[in-house]
Design a protein with these regions (language model features):
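Carbohydrate-active catalytic/glycan-binding domains of CAZyme proteins
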Residues: 1-207
């Protein structure tokens, strides 16, 4: 939500429906999060490819767009313009050549954290995370989190609920044709001064 324009701004991965070559960003806006969004077109940030992506908004209103670029080889971090309708600058090219996708970001008690997955199509893989003292600061090397399939999921987004960090992951139906069998998993994240741990639970209740 952009307080200056009073608009909800959506950024999304755009493809043309015929092939997977556009690797672009689409932008849409609406007065409410559940209304009819107005499409404002698509583009490639500074000419770069953009696929799996996420947004992060600071408390002061500064917003960032993070996406898989260069055929998923790198994760790019862009600071957005004040109205969230364009990129203002390219802040980072993270973990170049590591082929990370599905980025998800959260601010914890000690650090900012980013969880991502390797590129294995619909098959789950070992999730990894990194930390930094600020979005625009120096990010750590990648460290493993969860088990070898991230408990059969791929990072979707991270939540801070009353000070508790939660991982929300996509559990894909597989091969694209079984999308109706896909679902979500939610796991608590334990933050320490030494890092981040994903806690597996069969069921969980949150207040």
């Amino acid at each position: 939500y952009n307080k200056k324009t009073n608009k909800f701004v959506m950024w999304a991965h755009f493809e043309n429906g015929k092939n997977y070559l556009d690797a672009a960003v689409a932008i849409a806006t609406c007065d409410t999060p559940d209304g009819d969004f107005t499409y404002h077109g698509h583009f490639n940030p500074y000419g770069y490819m953009s696929r799996d992506c996420t947004l992060y908004q600071e408390e002061d209103g500064t917003a960032y767009f993070i996406s898989a670029s260069r055929d998923n080889a790198d994760l790019h971090v862009y600071r957005l313009s004040d109205d969230y309708m364009n990129v203002d600058c390219l802040v980072h090219r993270l973990w170049q050549g590591e082929y990370r996708e599905a980025p998800a970001v959260i601010k914890g008690k000690y650090h900012y954290y980013m969880i991502s997955s390797f590129c294995t199509g619909w098959a789950p893989n070992q999730g990894k995370y990194a930390w930094a003292d600020s979005i625009e600061g120096r990010w750590s090397s990648l460290k493993e989190i969860g088990d070898e399939t991230t408990y059969d999921s791929q990072s979707a987004f991270l939540l801070n609920v009353n000070g508790k960090l939660l991982y929300v992951g996509d559990r894909w139906g597989g091969d694209g044709d079984k999308y109706f069998e896909s679902g979500y998993v939610v796991y608590p994240l334990k933050e320490t001064e030494d890092g981040l741990e994903m806690i597996y639970q069969d069921t969980a209740e949150f207040e």
